[in-house]
């Protein structure tokens, strides 16, 4: 199944039913009074988070949805039937945006969570409602109100505790295969990973966390080059970033250069994202002799002026991966305790999350606008070449994200 993480849809709530004008007409009853009933309310449109979904592909081709209208009122004071609500299932992690105002209507982050996106129209009133001491036979009714209608933009961000950053072929997919039961494709060419991969890492008997791998970043990614830029937004909700660096690149390049490329592209994409806690993970250490390994580790750390945690591992040989997984679990546990005990810390993290999402959305919108200009034949000197940008309209391949234990 193709992985689709952005769609635009139109939703229309049902209109309210009109009120009924009628009068009581029975044998032996003269001048029967009004008995027109009210109409029924229109059905509303809801989005509901469904843990069984992991892509928005269902909304790629069917994009218009309307709830049922309310029925008109009946005679003998019968109220019209209410229109049936329309419930649209979406994956957990979907952000709902009003396309007209760009206002975020809500985030569906828990299974079963429901969000009202279009309110059904109010019912019309029958003529019985207008009976009074001075007007015993009213001929007045009201029509039902129209239901809400709006264009929505749905954005899916995978929910993971830990996100992986790195150049193509840094060993991110191999690392996920090493620490979880997930089996993403691994090969010796760039961009083996085309969509986010998720794996559930079990630590001990009862604890686990979710780790996400996105397509590798390349130089110029913040300007649209490569595949990874569009998927950087999926790291907005992670709690920790692991920066994987290939310590033994086949082309003999300096690992510190590769690390600096990632930091530079991350800063240009979202300065707030660089404030997320990050750990440096130096991979493929098994391919170096001990002295050379120590020298390269020291060189990378000094070149980056890295102050945070550093782990030296071999994902292929599973060396150091267990210690890293345990350290991540401890970090996540301590973070959860601190959030519960320190309201200021929790609010600061929430504000950082909002800032990251705002910056990511603004940057991606800017890239979309540049692409639209190019398609219209308008060129800009400042805009970067976006020929390598992954275009969902042209890509019929893809895969679904699966949580695997």
Swiss-Prot record:
Tell me which residues make up the OBG-type G domain.
160-333
Q: Where is the signal peptide?
A: none
Name the EC number(s): 3.6.5.-
- Annotated region Disordered: the residues are 127-148, 373-405
GO CC field: cytoplasm
Q: What class of enzyme is it?
A: hydrolase
Binding-site residues, GTP: 166-173, 191-195, 213-216, 283-286, 314-316
State the Gene Ontology terms under molecular function. GTP binding; GTPase activity; magnesium ion binding
Is Zinc a UniProt keyword of this protein?
A: no
> Which parts of the sequence belong to the Obg domain?
1-159
Q: Which cofactor does it need?
A: Mg(2+)
Q: Which Pfam family is one of those matched by this entry?
A: MMR_HSR1
Q: Where in the cell is it found?
A: Cytoplasm
- InterPro entries in the record, alphabetically? G_OBG, GTP-bd, GTP-bd_Obg/CgtA, GTP1-OBG_CS, GTP1_OBG_dom, GTP1_OBG_dom_sf, OBG_GTPase, P-loop_NTPase
Give the family from UniProt. Answer: Belongs to the TRAFAC class OBG-HflX-like GTPase superfamily. OBG GTPase family.
Q: How does it assemble?
A: Monomer.
| Protein function | An essential GTPase which binds GTP, GDP and possibly (p)ppGpp with moderate affinity, with high nucleotide exchange rates and a fairly low GTP hydrolysis rate. Plays a role in control of the cell cycle, stress response, ribosome biogenesis and in those bacteria that undergo differentiation, in morphogenesis control.
This protein is called: GTPase Obg
* Species assigned in the record: Stutzerimonas stutzeri (strain A1501) (Pseudomonas stutzeri)
Gene name of the encoded protein: obg
């Amino acid at each position: 199944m193709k992985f689709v993480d952005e769609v635009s849809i139109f939703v229309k709530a049902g209109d309210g039913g009109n009120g009924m004008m009628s009068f009581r007409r029975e044998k032996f009853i003269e001048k029967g009074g009004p008995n027109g009933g009210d109409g029924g309310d229109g059905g509303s449109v809801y989005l509901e988070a469904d843990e069984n979904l992991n892509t928005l592909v269902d909304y790629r081709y069917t994009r218009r949805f309307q709830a049922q209208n309310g029925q008109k009122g009946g005679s003998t004071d019968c109220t019209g039937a209410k229109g049936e609500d329309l419930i649209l299932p979406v994956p957990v992690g979907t952000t709902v945006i009003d396309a007209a105002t760009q206002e975020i209507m809500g985030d569906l982050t828990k299974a079963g969570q429901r969000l009202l996106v279009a309110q059904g129209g109010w019912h019309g009133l029958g003529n019985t409602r207008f009976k009074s001491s001075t007007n015993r036979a009213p001929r007045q009714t009201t029509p039902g109100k129209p239901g809400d209608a709006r264009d929505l933009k749905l954005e899916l961000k995978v929910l993971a505790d830990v996100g992986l950053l790195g150049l193509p072929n840094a060993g991110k997919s191999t690392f996920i295969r090493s620490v979880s039961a997930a089996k993403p494709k691994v090969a010796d060419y760039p961009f083996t990973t085309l969509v986010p991969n998720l794996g559930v890492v079990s630590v001990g008997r009862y604890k686990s966390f979710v780790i996400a791998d996105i397509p590798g970043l390349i130089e110029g990614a913040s300007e649209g080059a490569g595949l990874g830029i569009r998927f950087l937004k999926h790291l907005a909700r992670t709690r920790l970033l692991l920066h994987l660096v290939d310590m033994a690149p086949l082309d003999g390049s300096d690992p510190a250069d590769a690390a600096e490329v990632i930091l530079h592209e991350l800063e240009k994409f979202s300065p707030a994202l660089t404030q997320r806690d990050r750990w440096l993970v130096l991979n493929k250490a098994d391919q170096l002799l001990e002295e050379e390994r120590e020298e390269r580790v020291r060189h990378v750390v000094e070149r980056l002026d890295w102050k945070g945690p550093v782990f030296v591992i071999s994902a292929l040989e599973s060396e150091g991966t267990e210690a890293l997984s345990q350290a991540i679990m401890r970090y996540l546990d301590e973070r959860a305790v601190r959030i519960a005990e320190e309201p200021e810390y929790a609010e600061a993290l929430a504000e950082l999350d909002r800032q990251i999402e705002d910056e990511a959305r603004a940057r991606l919108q800017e890239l979309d606008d540049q692409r639209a200009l190019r398609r219209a034949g308008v060129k800009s000197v400042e805009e970067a070449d976006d020929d390598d940008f992954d275009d969902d309209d042209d890509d019929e391949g893809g895969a679904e994200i699966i949580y695997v234990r």
